[in-house]
């Protein structure tokens, strides 16, 4: 097995160590390996391929980190073919939330979510995906 060196904030390293201890992992490498496998597998759901999808992506970031908001604006414009709607809101005194409603194919939605997740200084990125042809099951 190869060895990969990664950089991360001390606080995240401590959280990983605590998580490993509390959940019976042998160490942080095992936690990171599982997290990477899960992340990579998220968009490998064959049931979503070749279908029209809608997605909601929620991004939380610190109000003081103005570069995140600017990057979200650029992503919205760069992916305007799939961004159906975008909403910005203040959460408490310190945070901002950016919400995107997307419509498109899995590959395009995956690329968008990946770029949002790769944006430095985001605190949380959450999303859900639903095939548009399944909407009728709710009526």
UniProtKB/Swiss-Prot annotation:
GO MF assignments: DNA binding; DNA-binding transcription factor activity; nickel cation binding
SUPFAM superfamilies: ACT-like, Ribbon-helix-helix
Cofactor binding: number and manner: Binds 1 nickel ion per subunit.
Keyword GTP-binding recorded: no
Gene3D superfamilies, A to Z: ACT-like. Chain A, domain 2 (3.30.70.1150), Met repressor-like (1.10.1220.10)
Cofactor(s) this protein requires: Ni(2+)
One of the GO biological process terms: response to nickel cation
Binding residues for Ni(2+): 77, 88, 90, 96
Assigned keywords, A-Z: DNA-binding, Metal-binding, Nickel, Transcription, Transcription regulation
Domain of life: Archaea
Keyword Transcription listed: yes
Function in brief: Transcriptional regulator.
Family as reported in the entry's similarity comment: Belongs to the transcriptional regulatory CopG/NikR family.
Record-linked HAMAP family: NikR
Protein name according to UniProt: Putative nickel-responsive regulator
Organism for this UniProt entry: Haloarcula marismortui (strain ATCC 43049 / DSM 3752 / JCM 8966 / VKM B-1809)
């Amino acid at each position: 097995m190869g060895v990969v060196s990664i950089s991360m904030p001390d606080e995240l390293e401590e959280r990983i160590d605590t998580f490993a201890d509390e959940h019976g992992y042998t160490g942080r490498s095992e936690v990171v390996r599982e997290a990477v496998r899960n992340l990579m597998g998220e968009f490998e759901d064959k049931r979503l391929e070749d279908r029209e999808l809608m997605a909601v992506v929620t991004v939380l970031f610190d109000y003081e980190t103005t570069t995140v908001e600017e990057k979200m604006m650029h992503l919205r414009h760069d992916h305007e073919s799939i961004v159906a709607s975008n909403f910005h809101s203040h959460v408490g005194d310190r945070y901002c939330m950016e919400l995107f409603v997307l419509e498109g194919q899995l590959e395009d939605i995956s690329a968008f979510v990946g770029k949002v997740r790769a944006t430095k200084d985001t605190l949380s990125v959450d999303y859900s995906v639903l095939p548009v042809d399944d909407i009728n099951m709710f009526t």
